[in-house]
From Swiss-Prot:
Keyword Transferase: yes
Protein name: Probable S-adenosylmethionine synthase 1
Upper classification of the organism: Eukaryota, Metazoa, Ecdysozoa, Nematoda, Chromadorea
Listed EC numbers: 2.5.1.6
Recorded metabolic or biological pathway in which this protein acts: Amino-acid biosynthesis; S-adenosyl-L-methionine biosynthesis; S-adenosyl-L-methionine from L-methionine: step 1/1
Amino acids binding K(+): 44
The encoding gene: sams-1
Length: 403
């Protein structure tokens, strides 16, 4: 059986105030990990007009100049003058950082071997993968991310000098659901809102973004005469960034993950060192899901992990393939159990998570980028019997579109 439906995902640029905060929090984390790979970091950032505040708990041997660090990130994003809405040179940087609670430290990592470290908190984490794109990510989100990335590439290289750092994109795709798989058919609607300088007309802005960004990013085969484009539908967007809206770390968790597909456990990523399973276990769940899909064992996979604070072994592991696998969910679960050690210490070791790699994750999504280790599929341990069953019952063809 098959049916058609619409699904929408959104993305925001690095100049969106919430994303600014994510990048600053992860820059703080990277600065500590660069000097002290065992640093324990939980750093939140808040921003509003002319102000950035860091707050949280950090236990580290590193010495970090937060004033220099915060201003460097804001300058990189592009807020370099008050006429744009924020100035990295003159903004106030407030610091309210304390040490990690000794009770949490005692329960999680003190006097424990690196591989025996307990989960930094309780919680549930999800991973998702789909064969609809090469990245095993939902096409709605991939296109939303790519629109923002292309827009700001053109801003940075001077091609579109009137574009400013704050923007949002949203893509709606018509899908066909077939045997549990999701097949993109066409782009139904595209929404782009970008901050801009006062000297560009809305007509020029809309024409340029449609021709030089949207139609450059989205394959022509997915666009038709019925596709709807809303470009700055509210009109002018001159006041942006923290002047337009307050920003807080961790408020774009759906943009960070799967664009509304799969599921989300509620925990944000940015500013957290890898002993926090909100981050490391979510990366591991994605690693599991994409490994199964890239191995051809399913067309779509959802993985749920849960943990208790101070306990290393997951409380539960769920593998759900939406009926798209020749194997049962129980058999896929067995492959996962045989192939992955999902304790925090092992996750950190196998994915090499004590490195300063996190600021980049806060810019354009944590998943779907091949440079991140959790995106590289793991060789799976599959019993001869299950391997034979998988080969003998191929996944039904769904003729997914090429991207």
């Amino acid at each position: 059986m098959s049916s058609k439906f619409l699904f929408t995902s959104e993305s925001v640029s690095e100049g969106h105030p919430d994303k600014m905060c994510d990048q600053i929090s992860d820059a703080v984390l990277d600065a500590h990990l660069k000097q002290d790979p065992n640093a324990k970091v939980a750093c939140e950032t808040v921003t509003k007009t002319g102000m950035v505040m860091l707050c949280g708990e950090i236990t580290s041997k590193a010495v970090v100049d937060y004033q220099v660090l915060v201003r460097r990130v804001i300058e990189k994003i592009g807020f370099t003058d008050s006429s744009i809405g924020f100035d990295h040179k003159t903004c106030n940087v407030l610091v309210a950082l304390e040490q990690q609670s000794p009770e949490i430290a005692a329960g999680v990592h003190v006097n424990k071997d690196g591989e025996d470290v307990g989960a930094g908190d309780q919680g549930i984490m999800f991973g998702y993968a789909t064969d609809e794109t090469e990245e095993t990510m939902p096409l709605t989100l991939i296109l939303s991310h790519k629109i923002n990335a292309e827009l700001h590439k053109l801003r940075r290289n001077g091609t579109l000098p009137w574009v400013r750092p704050d923007s949002k994109s949203q893509v709606t795709i018509e899908y066909e659901s077939r045997h549990g798989a999701t097949i993109p058919l066409r782009v139904h609607t595209v929404v782009v809102s970008t901050q801009h300088s006062p000297d560009v007309t809305l007509e020029k802005l809309r024409e340029t973004i449609l021709a030089d960004v949207i139609k450059k990013v989205i394959p022509a085969s997915l666009l038709d005469e019925s596709t709807v484009f809303h470009i700055n539908p509210c009109g002018t967007f001159i006041v942006g960034g923290p002047m337009g809206d307050a920003g807080v770390t961790g408020r774009k968790i759906i943009v960070d993950t799967y664009g509304g597909w799969g599921a989300h456990g509620g925990g944000a990523f940015s500013g957290k060192d890898p002993t926090k399973v909100d981050r490391s276990a979510a990366y591991a769940a994605r690693w599991v899901a994409t490994s199964l899909v890239k191995a051809g064992l399913a067309k779509r996979v959802l993985v749920q992990l849960s943990y208790a604070i101070g306990i290393a072994k997951p409380i539960s592991v769920l593998v759900y393939a939406f009926g798209t696998s020749p194997l049962t969910d129980e058999e896929l679960h067995q492959i996962v159990e045989d192939s992955f050690d999902l304790t925090p210490g092992k996750i950190i070791k196998e994915l090499d998570l004590k490195r300063p790699i996190y600021e980049k994750t806060a810019e354009n999504g944590h998943f779907g980028h091949s440079e991140f280790p959790w995106e590289q599929p793991k060789a799976l341990k599959i019993s001869p019997a299950l391997l034979e069953k998988a080969k003998g019952n191929p996944i039904p063809a769904t003729s997914a579109i090429a991207h």
